């Protein structure tokens, strides 16, 4: 599943195959776990002061409850793992009553980003 890349030897390597290498697995794991354990908060500017936006729904999503089956640490570890191995991370925004209720991870291999002539997402 997913993309594979040709190496200078002519062999193809995918992210799954790369993760079988101890060095790759260890590097990705250290990065993912290090970022995953950090607190993630949403801030807003109040004049020149930054204040934590604890009343915002998005704050709860990114800091305490991204979805019904993942802790914030698991979610951010997956984000970093996808960024390391695929270069992108995508999440489906589940909306309820006009607000984002959950962020569901999507396999980057199943998404084709579309960009306009200015390289901005469409």
Place the predicted regions along the sequence by residue.
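Flexible, gly/proline-biased loop segments at the beginnings
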Residues: 1-120
């Amino acid at each position: 599943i997913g993309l594979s890349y040709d190496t200078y030897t002519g062999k193809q390597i995918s992210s799954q195959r790369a993760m079988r290498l101890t060095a790759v697995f260890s590097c990705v794991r250290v990065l993912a776990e290090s970022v995953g354990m950090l607190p993630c908060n949403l801030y807003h500017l109040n004049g020149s002061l930054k204040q934590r936006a604890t009343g915002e729904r998005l704050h709860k999503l990114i800091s305490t409850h991204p979805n019904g089956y993942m802790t914030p640490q698991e979610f951010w570890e997956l984000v970093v793992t996808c960024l390391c191995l695929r270069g992108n991370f995508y999440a489906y925004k589940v909306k309820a009553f006009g607000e984002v209720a959950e962020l569901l991870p999507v396999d980057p291999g199943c998404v084709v980003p579309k960009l306009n002539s200015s390289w901005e997402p469409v």
